[in-house]
Amino acid sequence: KNHARKVVTMELQTKMVPVRSREGHPVLTGPQAMPGPSATYIAYGKSWANVSNTPFRHYKSKNHEGGISTPLIAHWPKSITAKNELRSQPGHLIDIMATCVELSGASYPKTYKGNKIQAMEGQSLTKSFAKNVNVDRLLMWEHLHNRAIRLGKWKLVAVSRGEWELYDMEKDRTELNDLSKEHPAKYEELKALWEKHAHRTK
């Protein structure tokens, strides 16, 4: 019942899009879901938590698709001419700031009160509003020792301190066929990139 209530609430909130600003102009709205159901395995067990994210594996806190894949709805009639269309290229929460900065015409600050501000690592999503954009970008995740790195169609992912698994996301987004042994060079390449990123951000 708890999960059903959340689904109904989400549907009702989605119907509130579009939202207009106080001046009466259309604005960009993006209801992005939290990654995976909230504390689901605590409420009704790990098996049902997996069911909630079917066909993807795992759930919130993990970096398989069941834990990180979330919908984003963009609605801005004045600037987005595409209607009721889907986009399949990967994005990340870090892209939201870059998107808002570009759409608003603002400039991202380099300093604040004399302190240097780290440059944005996200990329604006505005190009994807018009069409699907295929970008071989590097994305990484880590949460509670759950790790993942994605480059183009390849994704390397591990649960906790377990072994890495390699997946071709174009053919196997459900992450069922580990290709680590079939593509050892790609496995080692992504693993090395992950270690470099982990060292930079520790």
Regions found by a protein language model. Give the residues of each.
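Histidine-centered active-site microenvironments of extracellular/periplasmic hydrolases
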Residues: 1-75
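Active-site-proximal N-terminal segment of extracellular/periplasmic enzymes that hydrolyze or transfer
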Residues: 2-7, 177-185
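C-terminal cap/loop subdomain of S1 sulfatases and analogous C-terminal strand-loop tails that border
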Residues: 37-68, 79-89, 93-171, 186, ...
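A non-catalytic, amphipathic alpha-helix used as a structural packing/dimerization or gating element
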Residues: 182-196
